[in-house]
């Protein structure tokens, strides 16, 4: 192979690797943004529960839409034997 062909192949391989890496970065960034949104909703739920004594149904349904389950957070404290 001539040096120009090697350079072209190396450039194509580098572009493919860059696309894969940036795709992974974008996927992880979306996960982080989703987690921040979930954390904000949970914080608002906790704050409203402390203020009013009950939880907001709208925010619970928003969390349910994202697939987040509110419930038992201490797996070592289970009384369902």
Curated annotation (Swiss-Prot):
Tell me how the protein is altered or processed after translation.
Answer: Phosphorylated by host CK2. This phosphorylation is necessary for interaction with human BTRC and degradation of CD4.
Identify its protein family.
Belongs to the HIV-1 VPU protein family.
Q: Which residues lie on this side of the membrane: Extracellular?
A: 1-6
Subunit structure as annotated in this protein's UniProt entry: Homopentamer. Interacts with host CD4 and BRTC; these interactions induce proteasomal degradation of CD4. Interacts with host BST2; this interaction leads to the degradation of host BST2. Interacts with host FBXW11. Interacts with host AP1M1; this interaction plays a role in the mistrafficking and subsequent degradation of host BST2. Interacts with host RANBP2; this interaction allows Vpu to down-regulate host BLM sumoylation.
Residue numbers of Phosphoserine PTMs: 52, 56
Q: What does this protein do?
A: Enhances virion budding by targeting host CD4 and Tetherin/BST2 to proteasome degradation. Degradation of CD4 prevents any unwanted premature interactions between viral Env and its host receptor CD4 in the endoplasmic reticulum. Degradation of antiretroviral protein Tetherin/BST2 is important for virion budding, as BST2 tethers new viral particles to the host cell membrane. Mechanistically, Vpu bridges either CD4 or BST2 to BTRC, a substrate recognition subunit of the Skp1/Cullin/F-box protein E3 ubiquitin ligase, induces their ubiquitination and subsequent proteasomal degradation.
Organism this protein belongs to: Human immunodeficiency virus type 1 group M subtype B (isolate LW123)
Compartments annotated for it: namely:
Host membrane
List the HAMAP family. Answer: HIV_VPU (MF_04082)
The portions of this protein that span the membrane are 7-27
Q: How does it sit in the membrane?
A: Single-pass type I membrane protein
> Which lineage is the organism of this entry classified under, starting from the top rank?
Viruses, Riboviria, Pararnavirae, Artverviricota, Revtraviricetes
Q: Name one GO cellular component term.
A: membrane
Keyword set, alphabetical order: AIDS, Apoptosis, Host membrane, Host-virus interaction, Inhibition of host innate immune response by virus, Inhibition of host tetherin by virus, Ion channel, Ion transport, Membrane, Phosphoprotein, Transmembrane, Transmembrane helix, Transport, Viral immunoevasion
Misc remark:
HIV-1 lineages are divided in three main groups, M (for Major), O (for Outlier), and N (for New, or Non-M, Non-O). The vast majority of strains found worldwide belong to the group M. Group O seems to be endemic to and largely confined to Cameroon and neighboring countries in West Central Africa, where these viruses represent a small minority of HIV-1 strains. The group N is represented by a limited number of isolates from Cameroonian persons. The group M is further subdivided in 9 clades or subtypes (A to D, F to H, J and K).
* GO terms classed as biological process: receptor catabolic process; symbiont-mediated suppression of host innate immune response; symbiont-mediated suppression of host type I interferon-mediated signaling pathway; symbiont-mediated-mediated suppression of host tetherin activity; viral release from host cell
Specify the protein name. Answer: Protein Vpu
Source domain of life: Viruses
Q: How is its activity regulated?
A: Ion channel activity is inhibited by hexamethylene amiloride in vitro.
List the Pfam families hit by this protein, alphabetically: Vpu
Q: List the disulfide bonds.
A: none
Q: Name one GO molecular function term.
A: monoatomic cation channel activity
Where's it mainly located? host cell
- Topology: which residues are Cytoplasmic? 28-81
| InterPro entries to which the protein is assigned, alphabetical | Vpu, Vpu_cyt_dom_sf
């Amino acid at each position: 192979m001539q040096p120009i062909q090697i350079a072209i192949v190396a450039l194509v391989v580098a572009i493919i690797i860059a696309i894969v890496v940036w795709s992974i970065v974008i996927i992880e960034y979306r996960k982080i943004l989703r987690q921040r949104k979930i954390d904000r909703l949970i914080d608002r739920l906790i704050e409203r529960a402390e203020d009013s004594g009950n939880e907001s149904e709208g925010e619970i349904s928003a969390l349910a839409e994202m697939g987040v389950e509110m419930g038992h957070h201490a797996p070592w404290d289970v009384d369902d034997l």
